Amino acid sequence: LVCLVGSEMCIRDRSIYLKLASESNTYLFESMQGGEKWGRYSLIGLSTNNLLKLTGDHLQIIADGHVQTDLKSSDPLGEIQKFKDSFRVPDLPSMPRFTGGLVGYFGYDSVRYVEKKLATSTPPDQMNIPDVMLLVSEELIIFDNLAGTITLVVHADPSAPDAFNNFNRRLDLLEIKLASTSANPFDMTSGHQKVSEDSFVSSFGEERYKEAVRKIKEYTIAGDIMQVVPSQRLSAPFFEEPINLYRSLRRLNPSPYMYYINLEDFFIVGSSPEVLARLENDVVTVRPIAGTRRRGVDEAEDKALERDLMEDPKELAEHLMLIDLGRNDVGRISKSGSVEVTEKMIVERYSHVMHITSNVTGNVQENLTSIDIIKAVLPAGTLSGAPKIRAMEIIDEVEPVKRNIYGLSLIHI
């Protein structure tokens, strides 16, 4: 690992994001804490030709742009863990939690690698993208918005021939790229395309969606399920640069987890308040979020809406159910007696809404891996239901298309 720290002058040039986003297999992660102030760190992952793709039972490991390994496995997630175990990223106390490693997504349907009974009930796939896609992130730019610094991070194998000189060459190239005054590769005028509600096409259609809801209600009344979270895909043509969509989302809906990922054939743009799971210092954390009200126009209305939220029996019951679901997920991977609800029903405010949140932690069992943590918590209960497996069976029954990256989990390990 080699780091180079520069001054805040680099940070002020926001076009850094845009210069790098023109390349595939890059990403940008930003954060706004509580929806009200920017988080300390922003991360840019530079382009890589090393990645993993998993579709069905077919895993590809790509090195330097070429398929190095192409295999079918009954345990493809285990194969991903083996790949991760082949390298190590040092912990740096002066840096964010993540400074390189595997970055990408586990789609909603990656749960089928864990719950085998769901493997044969997958709805039709209209997107034809990998269920799991992970970039090997070896070159990063880390913005420290508090210290006013920018850090260039390069990872390489120290046992490789001429390793130190190679480090220096790569760092020099990054400095040149940052200092470049080349024209912006994007058309930033934005706004030429007008998208209305009529532009969107539903994967369901209104009547079929209503029928799906009726069927779910029948299952619920019969006691077969407590909650199911149905979804529908809404699609519309989009001709703007994808980075413009991210810029608009960043402005209109700033959240704790904002992400823009430029992959080979598609982009992922999103903004979320929810962490699925975090493993740090052998403590695993999940953070259930359920129960919502809009923000008030002033402090008095804001407080009135909070009181209404915290007195709503439906919202409280749903949140308690998700706490129980979180305790169950954490309990599967934690040492006996270590599971705790460290925060219970705290109202957090974001730019447009407020949510009820809780915090569930546990001391992770010895010899478990990061992939074991992911397997235990997929997918989020807020996007599936409870009991989770039965809810997903019903989702497969009523939804017309595979969810793909809807309900995905963005991963950095």
Residue ranges and their predicted role:
Residues 7-8, 12-411:
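Extended alpha-helical targeting/anchoring segments
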